[in-house]
Amino acid sequence: SVAPTNLLVGSTYALSAQVDGGGVSAVQVDSRFGTQSPCANQGVTNWYASGFDSTVGSSAVLSVYNPTATAAVFNVTAFTPGGFSSPASLQGVSVGPHAVLTYNLGAQIVATENFGVQVTVLRGSLVAVGDQISKGVASFNYGTTLLASSATLPLVTTANQAVAQVRIANPGPAPATVTLNVKLGKFKVAPQTTEVGAYRSAMVVITPNTAIPAAGEATIVMKSTQPVDATVVTGTQNGLTSSPVGTPAARVVLADVTGGGFDRAVVTNVAPTATEVSWVLRRRGSLASTGTTSLGANATKSLAVLVGGRAKLTGATLVLTGLAPTLVVSATLVTTPPGVTLTSGLNGG
């Protein structure tokens, strides 16, 4: 691991690593709160993120890094409940070679609880990440390059005293009807539906919600009539964290970087057909165990059960490989109430 704050002075930084041989998955971790974000392996030309908050007690920061040897130019558009905004100061912005820039989004999108952004790169390519502060609680919003009409959101808490929301941004020209089907143990929960106008944002509250009982973690299946970007926001009245909806992959890595362990960890097959999943568990660079399991259509399986106990995931790295890009890995950190800090698996390439 690398702690850049031991190497330089400054409030914001970017880190670029060159790997000689083999391949790696990397993650940035907030050492205080345990929240983390997968690192990118290349710059992109279009990037979306949702669920930002600039109300009193919160701040939303956008950081962009230019990984190339030539200058890059980009625009930023915001999507709010009231419509879209293209702040003049965030149009045609230039980023020098191997330079990093940060912007306080709240200076332009003032006192807005739920908004999304789109970064459009006009020249070159960029790596982008959002940094959301909520009452002193920090989390990373690593966003996405692809909008989705469907997604699976595992491990969404319904615990008492917890907060759970699905925040949605619609960057497209047509309104979207978004339906959330909530799977929660033996309970039958009515679908939660919201309308998201063109170039707008909206929110569905999962917890607290009188239609959804407090019964552990729910799996939510999202369906939308138009491609959208969604973020799960969880926490308590003392602060919230943001977790972008994961993109299914064929190879996913779950790493307990801090050594604090996981409360729950699951793998979900989002395909309508069953698949085989092989796994390799490593601890301190050494092979601990391996195995293979079958995973049914749209099924979720506990990773603790898979490897023989939750304790075996503590301080370890688990690599799961499927037959196609249909796997989503999610985990929750150990918190009170349970499930209020989510973390995602890393794309294993």
Where are these regions (language model features)?
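Short, aromatic- and glycine-rich surface loops/edge beta-strands on solvent-exposed regions
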Residues: S11-G21, E113-R123, A214-Q226, A311-A324, ...
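Intrinsically disordered, low-complexity Pro/Gly/Ser/Thr-rich segments with frequent PxxP/GP/PP motifs
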Residues: S1-T12, G83-G116, G185-A215, T219, ...
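Conserved functional hotspot residues at active sites or interaction interfaces
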Residues: G22-T68, S125-G172, P227-P272, P325-G349
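Short acidic, flexible loop segments centered on an aromatic residue
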Residues: Q18, S63-S86, T120-L122, A162-V189, ...
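Solenoidal tandem-repeat scaffolds enriched in leucines and small polar residues
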Residues: W47, T55, V73, T77, ...
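Transmembrane beta-barrel architecture of outer membranes
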Residues: T12, G57-S63, A71-V73, A88-L90, ...
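C-terminal beta-sandwich/jelly-roll accessory domains of carbohydrate-active enzymes
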Residues: T225-Q226, T273-A274, V280-L327, T332-T341
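Extended macromolecule-engaging scaffold surfaces
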Residues: V24, G82-F84, A99, G124-S139, ...
